[in-house]
Amino acid sequence: MNPVLLFILSASVATGALSAAPDGRRSGAASADGAAAPSVAATARTIDFSGLTWNVKSSGSEAWGPGPNRFSDAASNVWVDDAGRLHLAITYDNGVWKSAEVIAQRSFGYGTYRFTIDSPVDGLDPNVVLGLFTWNDDPAFNHREIDIEFSRWGNPLDATNAQYTVQPYTSSANLTRWTLQPGYSASSHSWRWSSRSVAFQSSAFGNQIKQWSYTRRAGIPKPGGENPRINLWLFRGAAPQNGLPVEVIIGRFEFAP
């Protein structure tokens, strides 16, 4: 494998589904009835982003987790610009709020997963969640879900707006909340996953702004079919509190073994 796989975008299309924990605080999860929603539809739109092919999740007229939300594969919700950057948007269409998710077709296992965000995310509406994560429909090891998420989970008074998690989040030792300060027009967020730890790090303008390591060996998932995913969705499916559509730009995704 090339020591560094660099992903910068371009367009095509596909479908996938995850679902939410009971209160919706997961970027990926089982469906509301406890069953896993399909990760890729039979006729999936795909995009090319950062050197990878990604499925674009579409729930059609149904609400899927996380949230649950209506996920759209429309070009107004997911697109790649001329500079190769991925745009995810939450839009309001015919009385329905529609969210966005992309799912890489490759699985990488242990290594460093790095996401570069090319837009501010400190001031997202309290009901909006941006998730950078791994997931596998197989429920073993809590779906092998590792998350970096930006959200206030519906609470506009929450001073924190970001978190690192090795699922399940219901164990306080598996999660740390923190605050991404205003003023970062771009930022980079990563985790290094090994059999010994999951080491998270965030930086902006060349400076580290947060780091945290999860070292509980029994809780570290083993690799097995998980893939990187990015989503922009509404907590518990609730409309943005400010009533406005949302857009986030992902500059690139990188993996290094």
Specify the residue positions occupied by each region the protein language model found:
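Positively charged n-region of N-terminal signal peptides that target proteins for export
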Residues: 1-5
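Bacterial N-terminal signal peptides
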Residues: 6-16
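Low-complexity, Ser/Thr/Pro/Gly-rich disordered linker/stalk regions
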Residues: 22-130, 134-140, 144-154, 164-166, ...
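Short hydrophobic/aromatic-rich beta-strand segments that constitute the beta-sheet cores
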Residues: 88, 198-202
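Beta-strand-rich interaction surfaces with strong enrichment in secreted/lumenal proteins
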Residues: 99-106, 174-180, 217-218
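Short, aromatic/His-centered strand-loop micro-motif at the edge of beta-sheets
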Residues: 165-186
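Localized edge beta-strand/strand-to-loop motifs within extracellular or lumenal beta-rich domains
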Residues: 183-199
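Short, solvent-exposed beta-strand-to-loop segments that form ligand-recognition rims
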Residues: 204-227
